Amino acid sequence: MIHFKKIIPFIIFFTFSACSSIPKNTQNSCAIFEERYLWYKHAKASYEKWGAPIHLQLAFVKKESDFNWLAKPPRTKLFKVIPFKRPSSSFGYSQAVKGTWEQYKRETNSPLATRARFKDSVDFIGWYIHKTNKILRISKKDVYRQYLAYYKGWGDYKNYSKDKKAIIYAKSVKDMANKYRKQLTLCKKNLDKNKYIIF
């Protein structure tokens, strides 16, 4: 006989998995929020708290994890064959590394925040954008340079011009953010209307 207490963790995991599945169309901001309405509420809350535009938040998540809550960097390989260590501790929607995530939790007094939750991830992105604005004086609306700082880190941002890959990534994020922004103009009014959510 299977004890109920033993299966509770599995029930929680599968429920969390179902709620965190990747949206069907991650190329369209309206489609994302129509499928995951609470995500719009979370992204809007981050914008109101930190000033990071919603389209920027989405573009960062799209680039970092493609909306996969369990995303991790692929493992490196020994002798090009044997799976080895991962190149960093990046995880979740925002691909935040452990050290920066712990700093975020301390500074925002959010001890229970997790990288696998969209709400916490977009709040983290908003916090990071806000700090980048304070530290590097980069406008919160400057998607290109904000992503360079996100990718390189505050300390290494000054060397971004030597990193061709970072520049390519930042340009793609800027393009994606512009696409999301234009799409949002078509559905934001409807999304801002009060909705009752039944769980």
Can you say where each PLM-predicted feature lies in the sequence?
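Catalytic glycan-binding domains that act on GlcNAc-containing polysaccharides
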Residues: 21-194, 198-199
